[in-house]
Amino acid sequence: MSSKRPSTDGRRDLANGSLSSSPEEMSGAEEGRETSSGIEVEASDLSLSLTGDDGGPNRTSTESRGTDTESSGEEKDSDSMEDTGHYSINDENRVHGHSDEEEEEEQPRHRVQRKRASRDQDSSDDERALEDWVSSETTALPRPRWQALPALRERELGSSARFVYEACGARVFVQRFRLQHGLEGHTGCVNTLHFNQRGTWLASGSDDLKVVVWDWVRRQPVLDFESGHKSNVFQAKFLPNSGDSTLAMCARDGQVRVAELSATQCCKNTKRVAQHKGASHKLALEPDSPCTFLSAGEDAVVFTIDLRQDRPASKLVVTKEKEKKVGLYTIYVNPANTHQFAVGGRDQFVRIYDQRKIDENENNGVLKKFCPHHLVNSESKANITCLVYSHDGTELLASYNDEDIYLFNSSHSDGAQYIKRYKGHRNNATVKGVNFYGPKSEFVVSGSDCGHIFLWEKSSCQIIQFMEGDKGGVVNCLEPHPHLPVLATSGLDHDVKIWAPTAEASTELTGLKDVIKKNKRERDEDSLHHTDLFDSHMLWFLMHHLRQRRHHRRWREPGVGATDADSDESPSSSDTSDEEEGPDRVQCMPS
């Protein structure tokens, strides 16, 4: 993969880099200002001792003249100076004595004043640059491609057979999103959301180890059950074409489990089908397969799971970069070519594999890799927290921690640059999700550490919707409805929120600029310390976890879910290590 950077990297790019100079450049500049200011003060003070064209006597020569006034050379110098400057040597020494004292008093004051002026100027420049950056992100939107009145007229005339389909991807509806209601049933952070194929049910998984299946319209749970996991449930998904009878789940304990649901609205049982040696954050479903799916874990392993087999899981690939394993946070199958899948994790590369062509002896089995060129050799520890294919598989969206969201063309060659970039949010505190919204993937939606939900128009990269989504401070999960203009979200709060375009007027994006400024400042400050994912917020999570630990313990009853015999189907050891099972649930690490 090419590691060349664009030739413009050396210039100050507000969109791609920091708004201010590096600390080393700032300190060097201030030292230069101090040195020059000291010279200016000395020259101005000493110039008072002469009225001639000279820049002022040298301090060493002044001392020599004061100690040896009998020499002929000094007399000649003194005579000539008296003729030109009208001062005697003694007068000159007195003047210099006073000027030295004044200089010692004035220099610190001048230095402080210049430092203050320099800081004020730098602050003013940074603020102006930040304003320019925010303005560039909130410019006027282009004309919408879909308008309600002409579309309604066409439907009346029978010339538009796909009115609902087109309306769901219209900007005007997205700009009218408002909170409809919340679904309350969990006692911990809600880490995963997934609609069934018909869009009638919504599954949610939580730190409380439960999975709830909702009738989201009636605001009632259809069923809830213990997942069988021993730590935070990170994902729960309906397998397609299974009659909503099978749920696949993964969690922080590294287990991949399958739940069988009955028509009587209860969970018959759950069983473990795979075991990672680290947390498993994401599952990847094949669009039409009720039996097969993929899982990825922080152990860098991708499992392919076929429920028709006696031993369902088999190791597909171990993700590596130069013989070093790369822990994985996210995985997604290309909906247009189900042989291909993409993964992302603890480095800056999006990796695409083809299940038919994986040869770990050749390029570690990777078909191709993508990465924003400015991050290829960056010292910042970039991680991919989530990636997702568009509806037709032509585009690939990747969200980076403490960076931006990037759109790649999945058909481009290895090492290709991104084609779009989406900015304004903050992705630092958790493994945050990102998604497309709209039947044709017209929009990009992401949560943020500031507790807001951001929606960008994919084509223009402009923010078109901005909603307060979580009182706890972080929005992690965003799940679009498969057929309707509805969005489900969750985060640190213990409920699920349902959004629909029912507002009387389009959003005015109130407070957006202030939030963008705050997110940008915090990100720039954190980038100076090069903190790794989770480090800056781990203490906060641990404290939050300890406050809820006693409340969660009552859900950790033995004998729930799969029995020990079920674990025999795991491709790895059935005895998980202390590292895998021992830690209590850490609050809201996933999306």
Curated annotation (Swiss-Prot):
Places the protein is found: Nucleus; Cytoplasm
Residue ranges, compositional bias (Basic and acidic residues): 1-14, 65-99, 118-131
InterPro entries: DCAF8 (IPR045151), WD40/YVTN_repeat-like_dom_sf (IPR015943), WD40_repeat_dom_sf (IPR036322), WD40_rpt (IPR001680)
Subunit structure: Interacts with DDB1, CUL4A and CUL4B. Interacts with KPNA1, KPNB1 and XPO1.
Region annotation Disordered: where it falls in the sequence: 1-140, 552-591
Recorded GO CC terms: Cul4-RING E3 ubiquitin ligase complex; cytoplasm; cytosol; mitochondrion; nucleoplasm; nucleus
Chain's gene name: Dcaf8
Pathway info: Protein modification; protein ubiquitination
Positions carrying Omega-N-methylarginine: 198
Keyword annotations of the record: Cytoplasm, Methylation, Nucleus, Phosphoprotein, Repeat, Ubl conjugation pathway, WD repeat
Full protein name: DDB1- and CUL4-associated factor 8
Motif Nuclear export signal in this chain: 39-50
Family to which the UniProt record says this protein belongs: Belongs to the WD repeat DCAF8 family.
Disulfide-linked positions: none
Pfam families: WD40
GO biological process: myotube cell development; protein ubiquitination
Function: May function as a substrate receptor for CUL4-DDB1 E3 ubiquitin-protein ligase complex.
Residue numbers bearing the Phosphoserine modification: 21-22, 99, 123-124
Intervals holding WD repeats: 185-224, 228-269, 275-315, 323-363, 379-418, 426-466, 470-509
PANTHER family xrefs: DDB1- AND CUL4-ASSOCIATED FACTOR 8, WD REPEAT DOMAIN-CONTAINING FAMILY
